[in-house]
From Swiss-Prot:
Annotated gene: rnb
UniProt xrefs under Pfam families: OB_RNB, RNB, S1
Function: Involved in mRNA degradation. Hydrolyzes single-stranded polyribonucleotides processively in the 3' to 5' direction.
Name of the protein this chain belongs to: Exoribonuclease 2
NCBIfam families: 3_prime_RNase (TIGR00358), PRK05054.1 (NF003455), RNase_B (TIGR02062)
Length: 644
């Protein structure tokens, strides 16, 4: 009787349209219930039975029920699932398999089976890539996944590397392919094999892509020739090797090993500027005046060189600082080192006065055993030899940026616009509360940005600098010349690492067109999108492997009284994140560890401070002593506690 009743259908429609709904993201908790977060201010409770229909991170539309002053959300429609492709650990065996996603907030096992054509018999503990196939909000009875790739067995010592690379869908090995002969590019190569070029790298480096030569000129001027490995002499644009390099975009440097952008035969041999081997290069000759200014007579040219020495950072630094046993093998090499140190000094001063110089942070290096175990983690400070190479590379990249801009009007540029204009007023207001007065318009210009950075660098601590970081925009890769505020430069285009960066290979081809006086085609914008995405994935992979290795390294320190100096890097409602000064590990200090009485404690991300009873006790950039309370291997998280 009620079937197909138009009045009833209308009533249903009316009720549906009058029921309040909200769209948001599901946040799971460890207690079974969850929340629908609509925005920063508003969230709704999701009871445990309703949480069975959704997963942490799902974007959904939910019906909002109100009972006795309490609102709760009932998931109704899936907008975007949190999980599509993921990695996890297999449980069970044969025909009754489940997979637990490798994610700190996803604890439930998802029923699964191997995809057709996947020839691996999965067993308990195996790591796999899976794809979600069913979801309760899509009308399915339950969650269900399909195993699409076997990664490795559970006890493999190299799990951190293989699982991380699979998670981010990155290559595990060097690309295939060989380059047998150099291309005929119609370039005249200058013979510089008699000059005393040197390379300065880590002792273990095989892919040397830069060699340096310096000489003194009259009037207190110095000449610097930067010679860069020339992979585009072997790899034709559009060839198979070129396409593979374009997809990879960068060499992926992970703790313990790298996955090169080019075949190892090229990166570590044919193109590598090895000592006493004749190699083709792309070179830049520049003149530096007494105050370190790069004069206008910049010259790019093709050449052949023969590096006369493979020097090592620490040995060169020791020698320049008059320590250690090492010394250059000849007076000619010693003279090169002295001249390069002079160039470094001049360029450093020029950048300090006219651009911006980054504060030196140490690099952290994992020392690994045969089975991937972490033997030690050492902080490697940036010493004089590192700075010699850095200053030479920055100078060479400034030269390329100018030449490409003036001769072609395009290239692959690193662009950083400083502060987001939308944040300028808030930035000025924040600085004012700390006694620094800036003009909201001026700070958006390169000069204004540099002026502010110098004032911040002169502050006694980095606290204020950390407060304004959130107002900064991100660096981008662009085909259009533009300023790099972070470096304090009008334009910056890298070409000094073509073995490990595809963008540098593109700039090589453009510079060669300039040398030959030919026209060139502007690179397509999608290549910059691919490069930015790959850079993001590689950084995430490096961080993920690092987190795993840090957890392994610090596991036996948990619960002991071993003290570590730690810098506070972030404060949130839930506690503080700190970086251990000696090894670079990131640890979390939960709010209850800071003060037992929650009502007396205020952790403010906005102000970067922790207050107890109204007194500021901790702030971002403070260095405090901590002990390791717990290391959770399944989430690779390190929990620390301040030393009372």
């Amino acid at each position: 009787m009620f079937q197909d009743n138009p009045l009833l259908a209308q009533l249903k429609q009316q009720l549906h349209s009058q029921t309040p709904r909200a769209e948001g993201v599901v946040k799971a908790t460890e207690k079974g219930f969850g929340f629908l977060e609509v925005d920063a201010q508003k969230s709704y409770f999701i009871p445990p039975p309703q949480m069975k229909k959704v997963m942490h991170g799902d974007r959904i539309i939910a019906v909002i029920h109100s009972e006795k002053e309490r609102e709760s959300a009932e998931p109704e429609e899936l907008v975007e699932p949190f999980l599509t492709r993921f990695v996890g650990k297999v449980q069970g065996k044969n025909d009754r398999l489940t997979i637990v996603p490798d994610h700190p907030l996803l604890k439930d096992a998802i029923p699964c089976r191997a995809a057709r054509g996947l020839n691996h018999e999965f067993k308990e503990g195996d790591w796999a890539v899976a794809e979600m196939r069913r979801h309760p909000l899509k009308g399915d009875r339950s969650f269900y996944a399909e195993l699409t790739q076997y990664i490795t067995f559970g006890d493999d010592h190299f799990v951190p590397w293989w699982v991380t690379l699979a998670r981010h869908n990155l290559e595990k090995e060097a690309p295939d392919g060989v380059a047998t002969e150099m291309l005929d590019e119609g370039l005249v190569r200058e013979d510089l094999t008699s000059l005393d070029f040197v390379t300065i790298d880590s002792a273990s480096t095989e892919d040397m892509d830069d060699a340096l030569f310096a000489k003194a000129l009259p009037d207190d001027k110095l000449q610097l020739i930067v010679a860069i490995a020339d992979p585009t002499a072997w790899i034709a644009e559009g060839s198979k090797l070129d396409k593979a390099a374009k997809i990879r975009a960068f060499t992926n440097y992970l703790p313990g090993f790298n996955i090169p952008m080019l075949p190892r035969e090229l990166s570590d041999d044919l193109c590598s500027l090895r000592a006493n081997e004749v190699r083709p290069v792309l070179a830049c000759r520049m003149t530096l005046s007494a105050d370190g200014t790069i004069e206008d007579n910049i010259e790019f040219f093709a050449a052949t060189i023969e590096s006369k020495a493979k020097l090592v950072y620490d040995q060169v630094s020791d020698w320049l600082e008059n320590t250690g046993d090492w010394k250059p093998e000849s007076e000619a090499i010693a003279e090169q080192v002295r001249l390069l140190a002079q160039i470094c000094q001049r360029r450093g001063e020029w950048r300090h006065n006219h651009a911006l110089v980054f504060k030196d942070r140490p690099d952290y290096r994992f020392i690994l055993g045969e089975k991937g175990e972490v033997l030690d983690i050492v902080a490697e400070p940036r010493r004089i030899a590192n700075r010699i190479v850095e200053e030479a590379m920055i100078a060479a990249n400034i030269c390329a940026a100018r030449v490409l801009r003036d001769k072609l009007g395009f290239g692959i540029y690193n662009v950083h616009m400083g502060f987001d204009p939308a944040n300028a007023d808030a930035l000025a207001a924040l600085l004012k509360t700390h006694g620094l007065h800036v003009d909201a318009e001026e700070v958006l210009t390169l000069d204004g940005f540099c002026k502010l950075r110098r004032e911040l660098d002169a502050q006694p601590t980095g606290f204020l600098d950390s407060r304004i970081r959130r107002f900064q925009s991100f660096a981008e890769i662009s085909t259009e010349p533009g300023p790099h505020f972070g470096l304090g430069l009008e334009a910056y285009a890298t070409w000094t690492s073509p073995i490990r960066k595809y963008g540098d290979m593109i700039n090589h081809r453009l510079l060669k067109a300039v040398i030959k006086g030919e026209t060139a085609t502007r690179p397509q914008d999608e290549i910059t999108v691919q490069m930015a995405e790959r850079r993001r994935l590689n950084r995430m992979a490096e961080r993920d492997v690092g987190d795993w290795l840090y957890a392994r390294f610090l596991k036996d320190k948990a619960g002991t009284g071993t003290r570590f100096a730690a810098e506070i890097v972030d404060i949130s409602r839930g506690g503080m994140r700190v970086r251990l000064v000696d090894n670079g590990a990131i640890a979390f200090i939960p709010a209850p560890f800071l003060h037992a009485v929650r009502d007396e404690l205020v952790c403010s991300q906005e102000n970067g401070t922790v207050q107890i009873k109204g007194e500021t006790v901790y702030k971002v950039t403070d260095v405090i002593d901590v002990t390791i309370a717990e290391v959770r291997m399944e989430t690779r998280s390190i929990i620390a506690r301040p030393v009372a």
